[in-house]
Swiss-Prot record:
Gene assigned in the entry: rnf111-b
Region (Disordered): 51-171, 189-212, 225-271, 318-341, 370-399, 475-499, 615-649, 661-680
Enzyme class: transferase
Name of the molecule in the record: E3 ubiquitin-protein ligase arkadia-B
Enzyme Commission designation: 2.3.2.27
Molecular function via GO: SMAD binding; SUMO polymer binding; ubiquitin protein ligase activity; zinc ion binding
GO BP annotations, alphabetical order: DNA repair; positive regulation of transforming growth factor beta receptor signaling pathway; protein ubiquitination; ubiquitin-dependent protein catabolic process
Cystine pairs: none
Keywords: Cytoplasm, Developmental protein, DNA damage, DNA repair, Isopeptide bond, Metal-binding, Nucleus, Transferase, Ubl conjugation pathway, Zinc, Zinc-finger
Compositional bias (Polar residues): 51-66, 142-156, 256-267, 323-332, 370-397, 620-632
Residue ranges with Low complexity bias: 112-131, 228-246
C-alpha cells in the first residue's frame, strides 16, 4: 500500500499510541475506537484466511465498513515508523501484540500471524497475494510488474527513512502485518489504494508511468513467445493480467523475486512497502523456487538494462523452449529455466553465445527436414545474441528435427563477430561440445550449403576452421557420406564441388565460417538422413549404413595441406568420384572439445582411417560420425558403402577412440603416416578399404571429441568393454580373421598387429593404431566400444575376403544390439576376443558347455551298481600274496633288503597305507584302494586312477 504520510501524522501517531496504551477490556471490544476495530478486523481477516476461505469471506465483509479507518491506521502506523525511536517502536509492537491478545484469537494464531509477517516473502503464505493485490492496484497504470512501482517512491522513502536502530523484528511485525492483511483484502480495497496513489506528486506519477510502460513493452516482447510458462504467466500477471490469471504460487514466487529485484535495482530509495518489508529481513529465507525466479527476474533487470538486445535472445530462447516442449515435454520447464538463467548470466560474461541445452532424446528418431539455410541462420542467431536473427530462424531451430539439435558451445568473442556477419554460417561452430551431450542438429547438408560467408578473418584466425567446409553427412539408408570440408587456416579452401550424392546440388562447398575456432565442427546431415547422434559424433543410420567419409590423408600436421584424392564410392551414383581434399584444419577434432582445440585432433584421423568407416547403424558415430563432428574431414564425397565387405571394413581402433574425450589429444600424438592412407585410397580398390580407412581415420579423431557426449548406453558399453578388457587380453580382439572361428584361440595373433593379408600390408598405420589402442587402454577405453554397429547389415551377407581378415571385428562394440540377430555375425564374432560381441561370446560359452556335457556323458562316472558289480570289495588282510612273495624274493636275490614298505600297500588316492581290516576295493586291473576313496573316484570317472583302465572293460577276476 502506498500511502503518503500526511502533515498531521504526528498527531495521529499520538492518538494511535493512546489507543494502544489504554486498551479496553475484552468485553468492551465493540466500543473500541475505529482504529483498533480496524486492526482487529484485519487480524481476523488474516487468521480467517489461514483457517478457511469462508471465514476469510466473512472477515472481508466485516472489514468493508472500516476502509477509511484502516487507511488512517495505516497512515499512523507509517508515521510511527518514521519518527519513533527503536524503543518507542518496540513498545508499540508490544502494545500491538497486547491488543491482538485481546481478540478472541489464541496466542498460537497470533504467533502464526507474526511469523507470517516475519517470514521471508517467499515463506509468507500471503506474500503472493500481496503482490497480486499490488499488481491489481497497478492495473490502472499498465505497469508490467509489481516492481513496476520501483516505485518511484524514492521521495517517499526519503520522507520516512527507517532508522537503522530499528530492529528487524519490530519492523516486520509492524508494517508487514498491515501490508499483508491489507493486501489480503477483497478487491474493493483497491479503490482505497488507488486513492492513496492518486496523492502522488505529478513527478512521481510520470516516472511511474514511464517505468511501467517500459516494463510492459519489454515484458510483452519477452514473454510473447512463452504461452504457458510459469515465468511468462508470472510476468504477464504483473504486467496486465489480474491476480487470477496465474496461480497463487506463481504470484508468490514472482512477487518475492521481483520485490527483491526492485530492492536491488532501485537502491536509491524508491522503495515500496513491499520492498521495505523484504529489506527489513536482513537474511530473507529464500526457497529454491524463489531463487530460480529471482534469477529469472534478473533477466527482467537485464531487459531494462540491455534493451532490445534482449529481445533477440528472448525470441531465440523461446522457440527453443517450445521446441523442447515438443521433443521432450517433460523437460520443457527445466529447459526454460536453464535458458533464462543462462541469459541472465551472459550479460555479465559478455559471452555472446547462449548456453543452450538442446539435448534431444536419442530415442526420438524423428528428423525434421530443414533447409541448410534455415539451420545455418539459426546457429548463427544463437551463437551471437548480437545478431538480431529473425524469429523465423529461431523457429526453424525449434523446428529442427527434435532428434538432433546441435549444442552451441560458447564461441570466443573474436569469432563471434565474424559469425554474426554471416547469418548463414554453418552450424558447425554450433556443434562444439559446449555442454551436456546434445543431439547435433541434422542440417540439410546437400540442399544448399551456404558458402563460407564469414570474413576471411575466421579462416585466417589462428584456429583453422575445420568446419569451414560444412561436413556433409548424407544419411542414405546404406551409407552416410560425410563430406567434411575443413580448410586449414592457411590452406586455400578446396573449390566447391557438387556432391553427386547430394540429392540437392550443394552450393559452393565453401563452408559457412564456423566462428568456433577449435570447436568448429559442423555436420550437415541430409534432411532425409536418419537421426544423427552427433553428440556421439556418430550418425545413427538405421539399416545398413555404410559410413564412408573420406578424410584427407593429411598428416596430422594441421599445416600440411596435402591433398589426397579420395575415391568416394557413391552408392547412389555407383561411380567413384575422386575428390581433391584440402588439408583439413587441425581443429576439426578439437572442435568437440574446446579445451583441446589443437590440431592434434586431425592428426589422429588417419590412424585408423585404414579401416573403412563402418556403416555402423548406431555406433558408427564413434568411428564414422566423428568426422561429422570434427567437420575437419575433407569434403571428398564419402564413398558410398562399397560392397558390404568394404563397409565391413571396420575401423576397429576408431570406435574405441571415440569414447575418449581426451583421446583427441592422444590421437594427435601418433600421427599415422598419411602415406598409407593415400596409398589405400589411391588405388580404387574394390575393397574401398582405402576410403573407409581414411574415413575411419578421421572418424577416429572425431570420435575422440564425440566421447564427451557419450550417451548412457554408450557409457554402459564402455564399461562393459573395459570389464571385458580386464578379463581378457584386449589385443586379441583385432587379430583374428572372423571367418575362421578356429582362430578364436585367445592367443591367436598378437593384437592389433593382425595377420593382414598382403593386400593390407599397407597397414603401416597399424603402428598408430597400436598407439591409439594403447592410448585407449590407458585411458580405460576399450577398443571399439561402440564403434561399428552398422556393419551388421553388410556382415550379414559378407564373405570376408582374405584381405579383410585383418579387420578386427572384435573392435566392434560389444553392445551393438543390431548384430545379435545375425547368425553370420555371431559366427564371425565367435573368433573375436573378449571384446567381441557379448552375444556371440556368450553363445560360444554355451556351446562349449553343451559340448562338454556331451563329451562328459561318455566319460561319466559309474553308478554304484556298476561299481559293486565290476569291483571286488573286501576287508584288507596283510597276507602277502604269491606276487608279493615273488617280488620280495626277487628283491633279495638282487641283494636288496626288502624294506617294510615293500610288504605294505598304499591307497594311491589318499596315499595312506592300507591297514588290516580296512574296507578296500580291488578294481579289475587288480589295483587296490580304500572303498571310500575309490567309490568317490569311480562315481565321477569309471577308470582306474592308476592305470586308467575302464572298470567295465573286464570283469573282476576275483568276484
Amino acid at each position: 500500500m502506498k500511502s503518503e504520510v500526511s502533515s498531521d501524522a504526528p498527531k495521529r501517531q499520538e492518538n494511535f499510541k493512546g489507543v494502544l496504551l489504554n486498551p479496553e477490556t475484552i468485553g468492551a471490544s465493540k466500543s473500541f475506537p475505529k482504529e483498533v476495530e480496524m486492526i482487529a478486523s484485519k487480524v481476523s481477516n488474516e487468521f480467517n484466511h489461514l483457517c478457511s476461505d469462508t471465514n476469510k469471506q466473512q472477515s472481508d465483509l466485516n472489514s468493508n465498513g472500516t476502509e477509511q479507518d484502516k487507511s488512517l491506521v495505516v497512515h499512523k502506523k507509517r508515521k510511527s515508523q518514521q519518527a519513533g525511536t527503536s524503543y518507542a517502536q518496540s513498545c508499540e509492537v508490544k502494545e500491538y501484540q497486547r491488543l491482538l491478545r485481546l481478540q478472541p484469537k489464541s496466542d498460537e494464531d497470533n504467533d502464526s500471524s507474526f511469523s507470517d509477517c516475519i517470514s521471508s516473502p517467499s515463506s509468507s503464505s500471503h506474500f503472493g497475494d500481496s503482490d497480486t493485490m499490488t499488481s491489481d492496484e497497478d492495473k490502472d497504470n499498465p505497469l508490467s510488474s509489481v516492481n513496476s512501482t520501483p516505485r518511484t517512491q524514492s521521495a517517499r522513502a526519503q520522507k520516512w527513512p527507517r532508522p537503522h536502530t530499528d530492529s528487524v523484528s519490530s519492523l516486520l511485525m509492524k508494517r508487514p502485518c498491515y501490508q499483508v492483511s491489507s493486501l489480503r483484502r477483497p478487491l474493493h480495497r483497491k479503490r482505497f489504494v488507488k486513492n492513496v496513489s492518486s496523492q502522488r506528486t505529478q513527478k512521481q506519477k510520470e516516472r511511474m508511468m514511464l517505468q511501467r510502460k517500459k516494463r510492459e513493452v519489454l515484458a510483452r516482447q519477452k514473454y510473447a513467445l512463452l504461452p504457458s510458462s510459469s515465468s511468462s504467466s508470472e510476468n504477464d500477471l504483473s504486467s496486465e493480467s489480474s491476480s487470477s490469471s496465474s496461480t497463487e504460487g506463481e504470484d508468490l514466487f514472482v512477487s518475492t523475486g521481483e520485490n527483491r529485484q526492485d530492492g536491488t535495482t532501485l537502491p536509491s530509495g524508491g522503495m515500496d512497502e513491499d520492498v521495505v518489508v523484504i529489506e527489513a529481513s536482513s537474511t530473507p529465507q529464500v526457497t529454491a523456487n524463489e531463487e530460480i525466479n529471482v534469477t529469472s527476474t534478473d533477466s527482467e533487470v537485464e531487459i531494462v538494462t540491455v534493451g532490445e538486445t534482449y529481445r533477440s535472445r528472448a525470441t531465440l530462447r523461446h522457440p527453443r523452449s517450445h521446441w523442447g516442449q515438443n521433443s521432450q515435454s517433460g523437460r520443457t520447464q527445466e529447459q526454460r529455466t536453464r535458458n533464462r538463467v543462462s541469459t541472465v548470466i551472459q550479460p555479465l560474461r559478455q559471452n555472446t553465445t547462449e548456453v543452450v541445452d538442446l539435448t534431444v532424446d536419442e530415442d526420438d528418431p524423428t528428423v525434421v527436414q530443414t533447409t541448410s539455410g534455415r539451420v545455418e541462420s539459426q546457429p548463427v542467431s544463437i551463437v551471437s545474441s548480437l545478431t538480431s536473427t529473425s524469429e523465423p530462424a529461431s523457429d526453424s531451430m525449434s523446428g529442427l528435427m527434435g532428434s538432433a539439435v546441435p549444442e552451441i558451445p560458447a564461441i570466443p568473442p573474436n569469432t563471434v563477430g565474424t559469425i554474426a556477419d554471416d547469418s548463414r554460417t554453418c552450424t558447425s561452430g554450433a556443434n562444439a561440445d559446449g555442454g551436456p551431450p546434445a543431439m547435433p542438429r541434422l542440417p540439410s547438408c546437400c540442399p544448399q550449403h551456404s558458402p563460407c560467408g564469414g570474413s576471411s578473418q575466421n579462416h585466417v584466425l589462428g584456429h583453422p576452421h575445420s568446419s569451414c567446409f560444412p561436413p556433409h553427412s548424407h544419411h542414405f539408408p546404406h551409407h552416410h557420406h560425410h563430406h567434411h570440408h575443413s580448410s586449414h587456416p592457411g590452406v586455400p579452401l578446396s573449390p566447391s564441388f557438387r556432391d553427386s550424392h547430394c540429392t540437392v546440388e550443394r552450393n559452393a562447398a565453401v563452408p559457412p565460417p564456423c566462428g568456433v575456432s577449435s570447436s568448429s565442427g559442423s555436420t550437415y546431415h541430409d534432411p532425409q538422413a536418419l537421426p544423427v547422434d552427433l553428440s556421439n559424433n556418430g550418425i545413427r543410420s538405421h539399416g545398413s549404413v555404410g559410413f564412408h567419409s573420406t578424410s584427407a590423408f593429411d598428416p596430422c600436421c594441421p599445416g600440411s595441406s596435402s591433398r589426397s584424392t579420395v575415391y568416394g564410392h557413391q552408392a547412389t551414383t555407383s561411380t567413384a568420384q575422386t575428390m581433391a581434399i584440402d588439408g583439413y584444419g587441425s581443429s576439426m577434432v578439437a572442435q568437440a572439445q574446446p579445451p583441446p582445440p589443437t590440431p592434434l585432433s586431425s592428426c589422429r584421423h588417419y590412424m585408423h582411417a585404414s579401416y573403412t568407416s563402418l556403416p555402423r547403424p548406431l555406433h558408427h558415430q564413434t568411428s564414422s560420425c566423428p568426422h561429422s563432428n570434427s567437420a575437419s574431414q575433407p569434403p571428398p564425397p564419402p564413398p558410398p558403402p562399397p560392397p558390404p565387405p568394404m563397409d565391413y571394413v571396420i575401423a576397429h581402433q576408431v570406435p574405441f577412440i571415440s569414447p575418449l574425450p581426451s583421446l583427441t589429444s592422444t590421437h594427435a600424438v601418433p600421427p599415422p603416416p598419411p602415406s598409407h592412407h593415400l596409398s589405400a585410397a589411391a588405388a580404387p580398390l574394390p575393397q574401398h578399404l582405402s576410403t573407409s580407412h581414411q574415413s575411419m581415420s578421421h572418424h577416429i579423431s572425431a570420435t575422440a571429441p564425440v566421447t564427451q557426449r557419450l550417451h548412457a548406453h554408450e557409457v554402459i558399453q564402455r564399461m562393459e568393454v573395459q570389464r571385458r578388457r580386464m578379463m581378457q587380453h584386449p589385443t586379441r580382439a583385432h587379430e583374428r580373421p572372423p571367418p575362421h572361428p578356429h582362430r578364436m584361440h585367445p592367443n591367436y595373433g598378437h593384437g592389433h598387429h593382425i595377420h593382414v593379408p598382403q593386400t593390407m600390408s599397407s597397414h603401416p598405420r597399424q603402428g598408430p593404431e597400436r598407439s591409439a589402442w594403447e592410448i585407449a587402454i590407458e585411458t580405460g577405453v576399450t577398443a571399439a566400444t561402440y564403434q561399428t554397429g552398422p556393419l551388421h547389415t553388410h556382415l550379414a551377407h559378407y564373405h570376408p575376403p582374405p584381405r579383410l581378415h585383418h579387420l578386427q571385428i572384435g573392435a566392434l562394440p560389444l553392445m551393438v544390439p543390431d548384430m545379435a540377430g545375425y547368425p553370420h555375425i555371431r559366427y564371425i564374432s565367435s573368433g573375436l576376443d573378449g571384446r567381441s560381441f557379448r552375444v556371440p561370446f556368450r553363445g560360444n560359452f554355451e556351446e562349449l558347455i553343451h559340448l562338454e556335457e556331451r563329451l562328459g556323458n561318455v566319460n561319466r562316472g559309474a553308478s554304484q551298481g556298476t561299481i559293486e558289480r565290476c569291483t571286488y570289495p573286501h576287508k584288507y588282510k596283510k597276507v602277502s600274496t604269491d606276487w608279493f612273495s615273488q617280488r620280495k624274493l626277487h628283491s633279495k636275490q638282487d641283494g636288496e633288503e626288502a624294506t617294510e614298505e615293500d610288504t605294505e600297500e598304499k591307497c594311491t588316492i589318499c596315499l595312506s597305507i592300507l591297514e588290516e581290516g580296512e574296507d578296500v576295493r580291488r578294481l579289475p586291473c587288480m589295483h587296490l584302494f580304500h572303498q571310500v576313496c575309490v567309490d568317490q573316484w569311480l562315481i565321477t570317472n569309471k577308470k582306474c586312477p592308476i592305470c586308467r583302465v575302464d572298470i567295465d572293460t573286464q570283469l573282476p577276476t576275483e568276484s
